[in-house]
Amino acid sequence: MNGMSGSSPAAPAPSPSSFFQHRHRHGGMMHMTFFWGKTTEVLFDGWPGTSLKMYWVCLAVIFVISAFSECLSRCGFMKSGPASLGGGLLQTAVYTVRAALSYLVMLAVMSFNGGVFVAAMAGFGLGFMIFGSRAFRATSSNSHTEVQSHC
């Protein structure tokens, strides 16, 4: 049926091995296990590149994103109060931003770079310590503060 009314045969899908060969020919390497090194790609094609300075910038960005995500998760920007559409929209917007940031961190960790993983966990840990733990929370002596959960 080739050649009938402008139809063309379907092109075969590229094999997984051809994808990895393409990445290798163009200088990129897709890791499937954790590795340590400054030459990696995180979130965007070619970022942070091969520069040690840009790698440290990348780690700092991942650290800040994960800490800020924890801040949004733990700070309780919307205290309990009367039901309102405006309050619900604001709460939904904050939740959506927090979810997006968390997914960005997850995708960054999927680069399998050990430094990115450590930066993400350190950011989440520091974010929890500042915004979720008892370390920086002012409480009265007769009240007990429970750690808020994500749910």
UniProtKB/Swiss-Prot annotation:
It is a multi-pass membrane protein. One of its GO terms (cellular component) is membrane. Induction: No change in expression levels after treatment with high concentrations of copper. Keywords: Copper, Copper transport, Ion transport, Membrane, Transmembrane, Transmembrane helix, Transport. It holds the Pfam family Ctr. InterPro entries: Cop_transporter. It comes from the Eukaryota. Highly expressed in stems and at lower levels in leaves and flowers. Its main location: membrane. The chain crosses the membrane at residues 52-72, 103-123. One of its GO terms (molecular function) is copper ion transmembrane transporter activity. It is found in: Membrane. Involved in the transport of copper. Belongs to the copper transporter (Ctr) (TC 1.A.56) family. SLC31A subfamily. This is Copper transporter 3. It comes from Arabidopsis thaliana. The lineage of its organism: Eukaryota, Viridiplantae, Streptophyta, Embryophyta, Tracheophyta.
